[in-house]
Amino acid sequence: MTPTAPTLLRPTDPADVSRLLAGARAVAGGTDLLVQRRAGAEAPTLVDLTGLAGARPAVTSDDAAGELTISAVHPLTDIANGLTDGAGVFPALTAAICQFASTTIRNRATIGGNLVTGSPAADTVPALLAAGAAIDIVTPDGGLRTVDLAEFLLGPRRVDLAAGEWVTSVRVPQPPVEGGFRKIGGRRAQAISFLNLAWQWHREPDGRLTGVRLAMGSVAPTVVRLRTAAAVLEAQLPTQDVVDAAVAAIDADISPIDDLRASAHYRRRCAAGLLREALLPPSGTARADQYVTPTTREKNQ
């Protein structure tokens, strides 16, 4: 049966959103909306948050606080442009957005939507988790609460967002200039990730890596930090032996499953390969801090 068309409200004043959300559901880009409605998720009234985007920039940088504030309601294209145009430097997130779905989807999809769907395969979440992001949430009474992204993610399709609440922005400490993102999917675009990896670190003058932070998607109920592997790399030169040790440490932090997209065995193999390529890019490829176009792999190897 065809779902009944919902009522759509599009406020332009943040003060109106909490009132309108009573008995309604918030949407932004709506790129996952039709999929969910076909699966039986009904909402008689939708509150479109994209009308709030005109009131503020997509990305702002607070040099004094040393952090970036990223709008949850601007399209991903605007976020990438804001980062590229000098509002801040966040190479892992920029690379993730460039590999996200397709141009058409990026012109609609938002950071907020990618977060609240709670998908362990979400492409923007690893970069945000690796950066230590905090989520700013507007409560039903118009107040504001902040929760660490690691605590916001509760499980597959489950996040710490109560009825009547909505995500307004994401704040991250200013990331280092060296970072990146890689994903493996069934094709180069319009594909859910079999696996993805985001990383960031400082490279000291002697080549040692410090402030190493790694996060991976599609290997656990939520996107997870690879803390054990990061600890192996911390303050080390990324020699072959060190990289081998870091790759071997990945298993301590992941728990992949078999599903329709890939097997657990395949995901473990890919996890090792993605980290190895981030640290020791094959000759003739982009450096680890540059964008990397995903490649198609045999998912059942």
Task: Identify the role of each PLM range.
Residues 1-301:
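C-terminal structural segment of proteins
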